[in-house]
Curated annotation (Swiss-Prot):
Function: This phospholipase A2 inhibitor binds directly phospholipase A2 in the presence or absence of calcium.
Record-given protein name: Phospholipase A2 inhibitor clone 11
Subcellular locations according to the entry: Secreted
Coiled-coil residue windows: none
InterPro entries in alphabetical order: C-type_lectin-like, C-type_lectin-like/link_sf, C-type_lectin_CS, CTDL_fold
Glycosylation-annotated residues: 122
Predominant localisation class: secreted
Upper taxonomic lineage: Eukaryota, Metazoa, Chordata, Craniata, Vertebrata
Disulfide bonds: 83-160, 138-152
Amino acid sequence: MRLILLSGLLLLGIFLANGDEVDPDRKLLNSLIDALMHLQREFANLKGSFLIVHKARSFGSGSERMYVTNKEIKNFEALRQICEQADGHIPSPQLENQNKAFANVLERHGKEAYLVVGDSANFTNWAAGEPNKAAGACVKADTHGSWHSASCDDNLLVVCEFYFIL
C-alpha cells in the first residue's frame, strides 16, 4: 500500500515539476492568454498589410481616397444606400488628383457615375455650360472626369469613395 501511495506522490510531483498543473481554470486562462497574443499578432500583421495596399493604391492614383465600383448600375438613392452600407461615401472629389482617380474608374468601365459637390468646394470640374439646374438636381461625372447636371433618377455606375486617415 505504501508503495502505491509513494508512486502516486511521485507521479504528482513529476506533473507539478513539469508545470502541468492540475487546475483547469489555470489551464483555461493560459490558453486564453495565448489565443489573445496570437490574435494581437495577427491583427498587427493585417493592419500592416492593409496600410501597404492602401499606400500603394494611393501612390498610384495620387489620392488618399479610393474610388471603388461593384459594377452595378443604380439611381442616386440606391447609390447612397449602397455606399452607406459599405461604410463608404458618394464620391466627392476635393482635389484635381482625386477627380482624376475617380475618372480613371469611370474610364476603365466606360460609364458615368454620380458625385456630390459641396457648397464650399475649392475644386470643381464642371463641363462647359454646367451646372445646368434644368437638367436635374444631381451631378454626374463622365469618363473624362467632367461634371454635368443630371437627374437623380438616372441609372449610373455605382462608385463609392473610401478614405482612411489613420
